[in-house]
Structures are given as structure tokens and as C-alpha cells.
Amino acid sequence: MPRTHAIEDYRNFGIMAHIDAGKTTTTERILYYTGKSHKIGEVHEGAATMDWMEQEQERGITITSAATTCFWRDKRLNIIDTPGHVDFTIEVERSLRVLDGAVCVLDGNQGVEPQTETVWRQADKYDVPRVVFVNKMDKIGADFFKCVADIIGRVAGKPVCLQLPIGAESSFKGVIDLIKMKAIVWSGEALGANFSEEEIPADLADQAVEYRTKMIEACVELDDDAMTAYLDGVEPDEETLRKLVRKAVQLRAFHPVLCGSAFKNKGVQPLLDAVVDYLPSPADRGEIKGLDFKTEEEVVRHPTDSDPFSMLAFKIMDDPHVGTITFCRVYSGKVESGANVINSSRDKKERVGRMLLMHANNREDVKEAFAGDIVALAGLKDTRTGDTLCDPKDAVILEKMEFPEPVIEIAVEPKSKADQEKLGIALSKLAAEDPSFRVSTDQESGQTILRGMGELHLDIKVDILRRTYKVDANIGQPQVAYREKLTRRQEIDYTHKKQTGGTGQFARVKFVVEPNEPGAGFAFESKIVGGAVPKEYIPGVEKGLNSVLGAGVLAGFPVVDVKVELIDGAYHDVDSSALAFEIASRAAFREALQKGGSVLLEPVMKVEVVSPEEYTGSVIGDLNSRRGQIQGQDMRGNANVINAMVPLANMFGYVNQLRSFSQGRANFTMQFDHYEEVPRGEADKVIAKYA
């Protein structure tokens, strides 16, 4: 089956936003207008096509990023719908990694919100070109120009308006297209309502000229010929302007801003035109860098069908009909179903079974996938999120994705033996699907511990366990993921000796143990010269050290950011073994942690509270009582925005407290920011509770 669309005609893009900015509704409208969805799904009716998990339809939020293919003006659009809730930023990271462009949706009333900032930063990290769509222009309080100012003030973006709204709130009826200098007016709010091009209303003509001039000046800066002509009094024509806006988006020189109301069916078609006209194709994004599988030297892959095949797995889902499906982006070459490939990230062979094109949760079998395609593969055995699949004869490892550490945990106890078995299977599937969700067993209590990015994240996992996998279990209270850290350098010389006749045990190790840089993790280095500890015992040393990392000396929390050097040791020809060195290393490391002034670290959250002004005093007083540090305040519309850093331990149940003293009018978002040392008095309480 040959390629149906040239790679230049692909647009792989995502729709990113803060929760409730109308992202899923915008996607639904896109699917409707591109002819994919016959009946439009409304989020508040729980029928959105892209939100197909039960939990999403109930909560009205998007949890998993579904991938969908549709067509507009003969271009092939692969859309990744991403969640906007802060507990699911991992999904956004994963999607951005495989996108070529993005549409950032803002709520016309709220402007740039905390999660918008997070997503914008993630898009910066992966160099994703983007256009901005100011949605909900029909809402009370919608303010297009405030949103544009927010893009500059809150995310240091460079907005350039390509459209201006005609009317606002209930009188919003269309947009001014600053490239054509025409008004686009919709004749009603019905689905697929027709629109017409008209002359710009007289009362908006001056404003249109002012913003068109700003747009042209931003564009001609990118092209010497256009700049020269403009200085001579010749404005660029429509086609030149579109080319220059496209160039600006690809170079991230500025961010074009459009507006509309997806819910009221206004502004979606021009947004689709902008996706086609301005967002890059895979060919525009150019080569992708990777590492040679054998030599680990940098190599490149080009987005052509003739290059060696390579693809990146960016999402794994469990599908009730097909089993495990792995969403992949093909970066180079082509692959047929039935092909044998290698997972170069894990050095495992895989066979490509069924290949599916996904439309939310409908699927279509395809026999072949080409550079630029986003496909779902059924039946892969060993592939995880972030792994590379490629041609075994020319293997490459595409860049790894980095995933954040979980900050909150709960214990789960199955109610029966049957539940125990179901729980094991379910958790291994959930952990494979979501790298920010970790599962472990508490060595002391034998309980299963689930770790995640926030209360909602874990709530939804528990919900999936109960509903999808029918596991009946007791769920503990959420606990903070504390960490332990050494503060002083220690030199420890330790000998493990057990010689009581017969084969004994003997191992001596001498370590320098010192704090590592924050976030640098654990580092081990052997500085042994002259064979004081034979090479075959070094893995035993590492194993002993690793066994302590999982449970520190203060209260059994994981140890972070520590550097260990093995500088000397001794062995016995008969009595030494890897096990003896493992035992010696474990004891020496524990001694170093005890003597090295270990302290407790706790996750500190970045909290933003949006509250009517009359409750500001109560909000600040309450945050202070939670050991919060107020970082600043500003106004957003008629609400006060309070930013603070607060330890996670003091944020449990905050949502109910905030609702009660603000009569439900204040809301908040929080996300993990950093770990810091727990004050002495608090630390003593935590140690007494857990030790």
C-alpha cells in the first residue's frame, strides 16, 4: 500500500491548555468540521469522542492523550489530545516529544493559567512551534487583549494577532482576519453554521489597521526583501504574509494569535486553516538526532521513506478488544506489519503485529506505516514508553524522555486472594502505561505502595483498578513521599568477618561518602588500584549500596543525592565472596548515613490560589498556617491571585477548607516544585511516626 499523502502534507500537532479552557471541545469541533465525527460530542454531556475512558466522561476532564487522524484541505492532520490537569503533565510531555507543532488554547476569560505556564514551558523544552487560540470569547468577562498581554507577562511569549474579535461575551459574532482585512461573521450558533466574508465594521476599522501594521512589522523582520519593500511603502501581499507567518512559527520568532468560541461553533475553520498554513510538517522539522546502538556516537535520521526505519513509543494503553496497544511516531523509513524490529532501548527483538490508525477509540487496520505517521501497534511484548523501535541492521536510540519523580503515595491492600492476583496484573499494566506512576512493596509491612503526581492522579488509578480490573481493595490515606539525604562527608572503614570453622565470610571496604548535587541522584565509583578488591566483587559492593538507597536510616525513606567512592578494601582468598562484600557495603553505607548528619527532605508544592478579593486575608492566613511562603499576589480580572510555596504534607484536604471559607468561590492548583529540608520539630514528628 503506497503512501497516500506526501510527508510535506502531514501536520502532527497537539492541543494543549489549562484544564477547562475548552481543549477537548475544540478537538471535537475539529473532528466534526474535518468530517470524522458525524455527531458532535459535548464534554458536559459526557459524550466527547476523544474522552473515551469512563473516568474521563464522568469527570469531564481528559486523562489520556488519544491520537486521531483527520483531513483538511487535502492535508493529513494527526491530532494528539492532551490532558490539562496538572497531575497529568507526564501525558503532555510525552505527546509534545512526538509532535511537530501545537495549538495552545486559552480561556478568553482566564487568560494564561498555571497549567498553561507548565505546558508552555514543556513546549519550549521540546522546541515545539505553536499558534494560540483564545477560546470562549462568548463567555462573560472574556477579554482578548488581556489574554495577549498575559502571553507576554506570564510566559514571556511573543504574541502577534492574526485576528481580532468582533464583539465579546453574548455579542461575539465573528473575527477580523488581519491578513485578508475582511470580517468573518458566523450566521448563528448551530453546528456547522455558515460564515460569510464581509467588510470590517466601521467602529473597528482603526483598531484593525493598527494591529495589521503590528503584524506586518513582525513579519517583514524575517525577510530582507520584504523589509526593503515595506520601507519603500509596499505592503506584502496575502501569500507573502502567510509565508512569513509560517517562517516565524517554525523559527519560533513569534506566536500567531487567533480567537473564537469552539462551543458556539465560531472560529474553528480559520483555526484549521492556520494549522495547515503555519504549523510545520515533519519535513520542516528536519533531521532527528539519536545515538548509534553499538558505538553510542551521535547519528541522525531524516524524515524520508528511504532512510533506515526508526520510531519512538510514546504511549501505552490497555485496550479491551486488542490487548496492549503502543502509540508510536515513525521518524524515518517505513515499516510493514509482520516486520521484525529491534527495541534498541532495551536490546530486545520485537515483531510488529497489527498496525492501527486510531480515531479516539475506533480503529482501522493498516499494512504499512511511513515517516511522519502516528500509529498504534498491538502485541508488542517488551516495549515501554520512551523506547525506540528500529531496523535491526541499522539500529539507533532516539533521545530518551525524562519523567518526573512521584511525590505522593498510598498503600493498597487487596481484600481477598483472588483480588491479590488481579491487583498484581492490573498494577503492572498501569505502571507500563504511565511512567509517572510507580508501584513497589513495603519491605516491612508487605503492603503494596502506589506513588503518583498528586491526589487526583492516584484517585483515578484506584478508580481504574476498581472498575476496569474489578479489584476490591482497602486504600490507605495519602502519604508524602519523604526522602533522606546525607549532609556531611564521611570516611568509613568497615570489615565484615564471620569465621567459625568451615567456609567463613570476609570482606573489608573503605568508602568516602558525601552529598551529591541536588537532583543528581546516586553515584558510585570504584577507585581501587592494585586489586585490593577484585573486580568480580564490585557488583556485590554496588548491590549492597543499592539495598540501603531504598530505605534510609532515619525513617526508612529512600536516600537521594549521595556520592560513594570505594577507595580501599581487603579480601581473603577462601572466605571472600560477592555476598560478603554486599553485606560489608550495606553495613558501611548505613554507618556513613548515621554519622553523616542525615536529614529528612519533603516535597514543596507551587500553589496558586485564585480568590475573590474579600477572601484574600483568609487565604493568606491559612497558607501561612500550613508552613506556606507567600511568593506574591496580582490581580486577574476581579480576582486576586496568590502564589505560594507550601509543603505537600500540609496540603491534604486543602480543597475542602478553601471551599468552606470562600463559599466555593476560590479555587487552586498546585504542582511539585522542589524538595527541601524538613524543619527539626516537624522532622521529629515524621520520624516518630514512621521509624
Curated annotation (Swiss-Prot):
Subcellular location, record wording: Cytoplasm
User: Binding positions for GTP?
Assistant: 17-24, 81-85, 135-138
Q: Which HAMAP family match?
A: EF_G_EF_2_B (MF_00054_B)
Q: What does this protein do?
A: Catalyzes the GTP-dependent ribosomal translocation step during translation elongation. During this step, the ribosome changes from the pre-translocational (PRE) to the post-translocational (POST) state as the newly formed A-site-bound peptidyl-tRNA and P-site-bound deacylated tRNA move to the P and E sites, respectively. Catalyzes the coordinated movement of the two tRNA molecules, the mRNA and conformational changes in the ribosome.
Sorted keywords for this record are: Cytoplasm, Elongation factor, GTP-binding, Nucleotide-binding, Protein biosynthesis
Q: Where is the tr-type G domain?
A: 8-283
Q: What is its main location?
A: cytoplasm
Report the SMART domains cross-referenced here: EFG_C, EFG_IV
**Which gene is annotated as encoding this protein in its UniProt record?**
fusA
Protein name according to UniProt: Elongation factor G
Question: Has UniProt tagged this entry with the keyword Transport?
Answer: no
Name the family: Belongs to the TRAFAC class translation factor GTPase superfamily. Classic translation factor GTPase family. EF-G/EF-2 subfamily.
The Gene Ontology biological process terms listed for this entry are: ribosome disassembly
A single GO CC term for this protein reads:
cytoplasm
List, in alphabetical order, the Gene Ontology terms for molecular function in this entry: GTP binding; GTPase activity; translation elongation factor activity
InterPro entries associated with the record: EF-G-like_DII, EFG_II, EFG_III, EFG_III/V, EFG_IV, EFG_V, EFG_V-like, G_TR_CS
